[in-house]
């Protein structure tokens, strides 16, 4: 019985992939990935002055990482909103196929799993850019022993934003809801990038990645798992109650 349930969940997850990756979603993903690559290459400054680089190599490496992470997180907000919009638009058509013979909890978990796998591959791609672009561009650049932290912190940030967007999209099932959340998320990131006081405050409660010459940090690392669990449970609860009313 356990094996059959496991296969059923895998099947649902695969089916949701087909709903998630439709033409509009694929276009947004493709354009975003290409733009991220192009902008990260530009941030590496192909026209830098070599003598200046030799004197300020560490500062240039830190600046590259900081600016690249900022751009990556902005594009992640757009990608997450696209996924949330797909969730809102395709929810009824996908759910109606299985509600009569499949638990709502299993349907909901399959959606989360599908999105989590997508985000894993997205963040792997982004971390590869953060490592390979400077490795190719900068003669003195060495792969940091914190590289694994790039992925962990990026994934924590991305999954937190995704679950929050899912929660909002499920509680307020209108197209404009995830778009408003995207706007607020981008505004917070812009303010954090430009105002130190705001960043110091916000980074204590939401996943804002900090970069300096000492390395990369995530001040809210102890708080974020609580938010992820809480928002996941709220999302599951709202989804379950909402379906019961239909």
Predicted regions and their residues:
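Aromatic- and glycine-rich beta-strand/loop motifs that create alpha-glucan
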Residues: 1-31, 170
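Terminal transmembrane helical anchor/hairpin motif
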Residues: 6, 39-64, 178-246
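Hydrophobic alpha-helical transmembrane segments
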Residues: 14-21, 59-68, 90-103, 167-181
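Active-site micro-motifs of SAM-dependent methyltransferase domains
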Residues: 19, 114, 186
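Secretory targeting signals
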Residues: 26, 32-84, 109-179, 213-220
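Helix-loop-helix units of permease transmembrane domains in multi-pass membrane transporters
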Residues: 83-116
